[in-house]
Each structure stands twice: as structure tokens, then as C-alpha cells.
Amino acid sequence: MAKNYDSVEFPYCDEVSKYERLAKIGQGTFGEVFKAKHRQTGKKVALKKVLMENEKEGFPITALREIKILQLLKHENVVNLIEICRTKVSPTANQYNRCKGTIFLVFDFCEHDLAGLLSNAHVKFTLSEIKKVMQMLLNGLYYIHRNKILHRDMKAANVLITRDGVLKLADFGLARAFSLAKNSQPNKYTNRVVTLWYRPPELLLGERDYGPPIDLWGAGCIMAEMWTRSPIMQGNTEQHQLTLISQLCGSITPEVWPNVDKYELYQKLELPKGQKRKVKDRLKAYVKDPHALDLIDKLLVLDPTQRLDSDDALNNDFFWSDPMPSDLKNMLSTHNQSMFEYLAPPRRRGGHMPQQPANQARNPAATNQSEFERVF
């Protein structure tokens, strides 16, 4: 355990009491996140509590991995880890238990997350502002992928935005380094990553030798969500999620995805047959810009080897045609309250309500406006 601590480049852990907790802004399997301020300087920060699943096993390897990755990644569009703090420990603590107790990761504070902003009907994004959001998101992905890091949990709630309109990729709790597989030795990463509604088809089919395309699928889901205001494919199970993907992106077959039949799950699951690709048709009621539709379509490609990467996505005509990307600062300045998914009122948390199976879903035209906004 001491060896694990020594590998983290923070020479000691300050006490978390140097920060005053102001509000809880997040909750999940990872633990809790609090808005706080430095008692002396007044600087606002976010405190992420490290969940000690089994303290006898020492410092959680997932938290250690997150810390190491965040120490490596320094970019305007990646959340900044300031330091690591702990609760007060015994005066008899030694080098082997100097960070015993509750551990907190301390980050620069961001006023909003994208899920919180999209859950608020009063927040209106112009096309130029959506372009800026996606440009910053893809810049962040380009940077982490160049540094051989996969995020593995791309979703709107993990996209933070500061009051000045700067986007930060956040929550690297599932992130990991990756390498190009050698023919004789394919990678064997876990495929139990990425929140279900944003999980790409290759992971749902059991792929363990994957790379950056898994994050780009999530980017495509998030981009569509900028218009639909809620996740576009809200499956209840992995098979249901694959069914929704097939209904939107077309049937999963070897014709559109060579060698997909190599997956054992592909043979076992009864996936929809004869489905045509409908990404543009289904989204055009929301997305009026043809370049935007084109980019979403190229990100939501079934075959990961044909999916657009972040570099090509940033060169898409969407970002280089009028209206050009514009800052979010002015729009955000009209909203004084922080907006996070965790704090969204229940009636606005449509993203948390699983979509009905296709054979039970009602005609959108027959739903009231609030229901129509919730389910794509």
C-alpha cells in the first residue's frame, strides 16, 4: 500500500478541513462530490470523495489510476486536479498510513455539467454555441487519445462547463491507458465500461480489444443530445440497447460491419433484421443543420474502424461553415445558478427515465410536451 502512495506525485496529503464544504453536487457509485471553498483564499473547488470499497485492501486501484492519469493530462479541456486531501489522521500515523482515513481529490470548480444545462428548459444553445461545445469536447478527446488514454465514460454528466464557457472532460474514474494490440496478443480490456445509454455496439457485443472509437460513439450521442435535450437511446438492458442502436443505425450485419459475426454474443442475441439506417431521418426533426446531421451520422457508425476519429471530426464542415463557433460566456452569464444533473428537479430529469421498449412506446405526436422532450 505504501508503494502505491509513493507512486503518486503528491508528497503529502493536506487535511480536507482547509476547505469549507458548501453543497453536494454529485453522487454515484464512485462516492460523492461537493462544492467547497478554500477557507483562506476563498477559491472555489470540487471535492471528490474516494470510495474506500475495502480499506483492508489499501488504496483503491481505480482511484490510483484516476490520479495517475489526471497528473499526466494537462489541457484546457480536461478537468484539473489540484491536490489530494484527507480527513484528520492520528498523530501516530507513519509512512505506511499517512493517508489513512477518507481521501478527497480536489479539482478546479466548474459551475455546470452539460446534463444539468440540458435539463433546464431556460438554457437555449444557438447553433454557434453547440459548435463551440462540440469543438471543445473533441479537442479534449483528441488530446487524451494522443496521450494514449481512453475516457471510457463519455456522457453529458461528465462534461463540465465553467462560468466562462470553457468545457472540461471530467470523471476519469473508468479511464485507462491503451496501446495498439499486436496480432498475436490482442488487448483484453474490460467491456463493462461506459454508461449503458452511451455504450457503443462493440462493447455491448463483448469486444475487449478496443480503442478511441468507443469515446467517439459517446461524443456522437452527446452531440445529438444537444438538440434532443435527453439521451437518444435509453435502453433498459444491454440487449435492449443493441435493439435501439439497430433501429437507429441499421441492422448489425457483416455487410456493414465486417467480421461482426466473430462475436459470440452476436450469434446468441436476436437482433433486429432488415433495419435501415435512420440517423439523419430520425434526427432531422430536431437538427436542422445538414453539416450537424452529417457529423452525428459519421460518429454513430456501427463499425468502430469506420467511425470518425477526433481529428477528422474537428475538420468536418460543421465547424468550418457559417455560423462559426462562438463563446458560451454571454449565454451562461444570464444564468446565475449552477446546473448539475444531480441537482436537476425530478420533473426535469428525463435522462434518468429508461425509454419504453419499442413495441410499447407511444406515438410522440400523442405525448404532451414534457414527455416529448424526455424521450427521443
Swiss-Prot record:
Q: Where is the composition biased (Low complexity)?
A: 354-369
Where, by residue number, is the active site? 153
Keyword terms? ATP-binding, Kinase, Nucleotide-binding, Nucleus, Serine/threonine-protein kinase, Transcription, Transcription regulation, Transferase
Biological processes, Gene Ontology terms: positive regulation of protein localization to chromatin; positive regulation of transcription by RNA polymerase II; positive regulation of transcription elongation by RNA polymerase II
In short, the EC number is 2.7.11.22, 2.7.11.23
Q: What is its main location?
A: nucleus
Record has S-adenosyl-L-methionine as a keyword: no
Can you tell me which residues bind ATP?
25-33, 48
Against InterPro entries, the record matches this protein to: CDK, Kinase-like_dom_sf, Prot_kinase_dom, Protein_kinase_ATP_BS, Ser/Thr_kinase_AS
Note the Gene3D superfamilies from the entry. Answer: Phosphorylase Kinase, domain 1, Transferase(Phosphotransferase) domain 1
Where is the stretch described as Disordered?
A: 345-376
Q: Gene Ontology terms, cellular component aspect?
A: nucleus; P-TEFb complex
Q: Name one GO molecular function term.
A: protein serine/threonine kinase activity
- Family per similarity comment: Belongs to the protein kinase superfamily. CMGC Ser/Thr protein kinase family. CDC2/CDKX subfamily.
Quaternary form? Associates with cyclin-T to form P-TEFb.
Q: What does the UniProt function comment say about this protein? A: Member of the cyclin-dependent kinase pair (CDK9/cyclin-T) complex, also called positive transcription elongation factor B (P-TEFb), which is proposed to facilitate the transition from abortive to production elongation by phosphorylating the CTD (C-terminal domain) of the large subunit of RNA polymerase II (RNAP II) and SUPT5H.
Query: Under which name does UniProt file this protein?
Result: Cyclin-dependent kinase 9-A
Q: Which organism is it from?
A: Xenopus laevis
Per the record, the gene is cdk9-a
